[in-house]
């Protein structure tokens, strides 16, 4: 049997796997256990009461967290004319059409989010095999194919997170950095859960949000007592 590292022993000693922690206690514990040499992210896993095998029960969307994610985001926009100018003014790092597509095909992909105006999809459509596997393909369901590219750029810069359930019906995303305050992480989590509830498929029956867990990049998962969150969630 592999020998446990000091870090893993510490996590095992302090995290009760069967306990549901109040949000403040959970965040305090995550901060205590975040000992990596880099600033760890605080990630969330939300188990949904859906049948992920059925297309009408899949959950996908995006929401802007009130306190952002704590990371800087580089945005590429496929647009032309007035939309291109609006994207630049909103802070997009890369803006173009065929010229930008050529850079992507050449492997120049120094960006985290791709946004496109509807008329640019004829160009973006050629990049599906490159952008798709990386989760970068623009999609109207998450607001990255839109006539209002400036607003989409601002949302991306403001800390918008995109979510999509996996084959087990679990949403995985981030709600900030471990250096964020308890208050900010709590409000970001609540905002995400509100968005997920609004996105609940009509075909989903029974308990919708079954379990919420937080973890840091290098840490163990901590289950959250949903009763400790805002009543609006």
UniProtKB/Swiss-Prot annotation:
Gene3D superfamilies: 3.30.190.20, 3.40.50.790
A GO CC annotation given for this chain: cytosolic large ribosomal subunit
GO molecular function terms attached to this record: rRNA binding; structural constituent of ribosome; tRNA binding
tRNA-binding keyword on record: yes
Biological process annotations from GO: regulation of translation; translation
Keyword Ribonucleoprotein: yes
HAMAP family: Ribosomal_uL1_B
Biological function: Binds directly to 23S rRNA. The L1 stalk is quite mobile in the ribosome, and is involved in E site tRNA release. Protein L1 is also a translational repressor protein, it controls the translation of the L11 operon by binding to its mRNA.
The protein's name: Large ribosomal subunit protein uL1
Gene: rplA
